[in-house]
Amino acid sequence: MLLVIDVGNSNIVLGIYDGDSLVRDWRVSTDKSKTTDEYGILVHELFRLAGIDFSRITDIIISSVVPTLTGVLEKLSLQYFDFKPYVVGPGIKTGMSIHYDNPKEVGADRIVNAVAGYEKHHTALIIVDFGTATTFDYVNKRGEYCGGAIAPGLMISMEALFQKASKLPRVEITKPPAIVAKNTVNSMQAGIFYGYVGLVDGIVTRMKGEGKENPKVIATGGLAGLIAPESTTIEEVDEYLTLEGLRILYQRNRES
């Protein structure tokens, strides 16, 4: 079995693959203060509750945008599983040309998503990933990563509004009853929610105009399911795109 780990700024998503099949997945909060042993205990407990024995894991692949945790999880693999993990970054074969001024600057999660998206669809793509930051990535018809855009995520936008406007409360991110809201909470929700839908559709539309390939637009990430139904540009939500990308990269590097 393969353990895939996607480390984001807000959440860590773990998945277990048996061959090509995702058999279990978990989402936990990212905690930069946790030690290798603390993460080891967490993983052990998740496995125990799922009835999965550590000995069944034969390989691990990690994608991380939190450098301090990359080393922590590499050590976890060595200490608790007795082997070195694959880590997405320099030296990992992606099978994809990266057209970026400095390819090393591209977040590991963005490359993983691009690889998975093209492997599944084999056409030009715009991938929208709703994370701590929302990323927009363009893959052309030849399967080359062409770059993209980065915007503040929904949670960052809401927190900024709460922190900078002293009379406004912290509210839940959800679709409000109406865009013409009748109270402060719904007004904030309307501004954030519909403003974000407009941001997504605006950036995607401009990317489509620049690329001129009529790309398919897919979304992933924790809040994709909230925004996608109101978007006029998102065609598909793929909840497990990043985990699939890690599985694909593992297979490409294991076989090479």
Swiss-Prot record:
GO terms for cellular component: cytoplasm. It is found in: Cytoplasm. It catalyses: (R)-pantothenate + ATP = (R)-4'-phosphopantothenate + ADP + H(+). Pathway: Cofactor biosynthesis; coenzyme A biosynthesis; CoA from (R)-pantothenate: step 1/5. Its cofactor is NH4(+); K(+). SUPFAM superfamilies: Actin-like ATPase domain. This is Type III pantothenate kinase. It comes from Geotalea daltonii (strain DSM 22248 / JCM 15807 / FRC-32). The lineage of its organism: Bacteria, Pseudomonadati, Thermodesulfobacteriota, Desulfuromonadia, Geobacterales.
